[in-house]
Amino acid sequence: MCGRFQLDVNDSEFRSIFKSLNYTPTNSVSESGDFTPSLLLPSLCLNRNGKIAVKALKWGLSAPSGKGLLINARSETVFTKPFFRSDFENRRCLIPAHGFYEWDAEKKKILFKRYDGAMFFLGGIFRRLETDDKCLILTRSARPPVSAVHDREPIMLEIKQARAWLTNTDAAKEYA
């Protein structure tokens, strides 16, 4: 599960990528630090013209039962479950991050990040709603070192995988 992640919008890599897409942080999107469910996240997605664009997405979607907030979806089943299938096929997104947190058995928060500290993307899906566009982060079975702490981890993508994740459903299935 991924319930909190870290992003530094002052990072030169973040600024370079997002500036090239004409993005300027606004008051509506949380600026930096730890991001938690219900916050607006700066995200990459395809616009209606099929171009990569920056979009503010609210993290979390009401559960089908109407009770609770879904913040993650299992990558193994997201393209087969009716509740998620259309979102996976048509509305994938990328959420920039510098790290994510998991909690160990003693409820101690542990930060996982790249060894070089570079930015990466969390793979997600989003849904257009009347009020806000909402997103979920996709997870998979954890691999070391995360598996020592938790059984799930977010889908993590390198910058070079971004375009394929957003534009190619078959490639996205492979990454998931």
What is the role of each PLM region?
Residues 1-176:
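Short linear sequence motif anchored by a di-proline
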